[in-house]
Amino acid sequence: MIGRLQGILLEKQPPEILLNVQGVGYELLLPMTSFYDLPEIGQETTLFTHLVVREDAHLLFGFAQKTDRTLFRELIKTNGVGPKLALAILSAMSVEQFAYAIEREELSKLTKIPGVGKKTAERLLVELKGKFKGVKQSDFFVESTHIPLSPSIESHSESSSDEAISALIALGYKPAEAEKMVKRVAKPELTSEQVIREALKAAL
């Protein structure tokens, strides 16, 4: 089992990246909450990983924090929640936000995530409620780290919006819905990652 990778970031196209580890290129899928923490292309990064083995593919998922991977593993244990849906959940909410929604039994927030219907949300509440009692109450309200604008990242509004729409579709949103979400928040000065984050935040 591959549990951790450290290497040079070669490519990033939300939610996928290519990581060079001693000459071997690893393709990883990341939730957007981890994607936001990535450095610039060409820089080194370390990710905690989880390997999903299927008949048709081996999928490697990466996480900036071990707590993100822990929640991912708890989610895929839940009946009806596969890796793709777990990725969408972790992209829409931080671990703290998800824990707070579970402990407060906020079904409406959970059902706004693509692929999470009422029954799935109820199963998540039943199976995961109480598992976050060790999380400090103050941690529930930690805001996502602000990402400064970087001149080295493509900031042209059209390409940023297109990349953001593609990423949201990959996370399970319907094309028309993804386009509407992006149009609502897109600004010329925002990078694709910032557009995605604002779109996901507005959706909740």
Swiss-Prot record:
Region described as Domain I: spans on this chain: 1-64
One Pfam family per UniProt: RuvA_N
Segments for region (Domain II): 65-143
Keyword field: Cytoplasm, DNA damage, DNA recombination, DNA repair, DNA-binding
Compartments, record wording: Cytoplasm
CC terms in the record's Gene Ontology section: cytoplasm; Holliday junction helicase complex; Holliday junction resolvase complex
Source superkingdom: Bacteria
UniProt GO MF annotations: ATP binding; four-way junction DNA binding; four-way junction helicase activity
CDD domains: UBA_RuvA_C
One record GO biological process: DNA recombination
Region listing for Flexible linker, in residue ranges: 144-155
UniProt-listed InterPro entries: DNA_helicase_Holl-junc_RuvA_I, Hlx-hairpin-Hlx_DNA-bd_motif, NA-bd_OB-fold, RuvA, RuvA_2-like, RuvA_C, RuvA_C_sf
Chief site of localization: cytoplasm
Region (Domain III): 156-204
Subunit structure: Homotetramer. Forms an RuvA(8)-RuvB(12)-Holliday junction (HJ) complex. HJ DNA is sandwiched between 2 RuvA tetramers; dsDNA enters through RuvA and exits via RuvB. An RuvB hexamer assembles on each DNA strand where it exits the tetramer. Each RuvB hexamer is contacted by two RuvA subunits (via domain III) on 2 adjacent RuvB subunits; this complex drives branch migration. In the full resolvosome a probable DNA-RuvA(4)-RuvB(12)-RuvC(2) complex forms which resolves the HJ.
Function: The RuvA-RuvB-RuvC complex processes Holliday junction (HJ) DNA during genetic recombination and DNA repair, while the RuvA-RuvB complex plays an important role in the rescue of blocked DNA replication forks via replication fork reversal (RFR). RuvA specifically binds to HJ cruciform DNA, conferring on it an open structure. The RuvB hexamer acts as an ATP-dependent pump, pulling dsDNA into and through the RuvAB complex. HJ branch migration allows RuvC to scan DNA until it finds its consensus sequence, where it cleaves and resolves the cruciform DNA.
Domain remark from Swiss-Prot or TrEMBL: Has three domains with a flexible linker between the domains II and III and assumes an 'L' shape. Domain III is highly mobile and contacts RuvB.
Family: Belongs to the RuvA family.
Protein name (record): Holliday junction branch migration complex subunit RuvA
Gene it is expressed from: ruvA
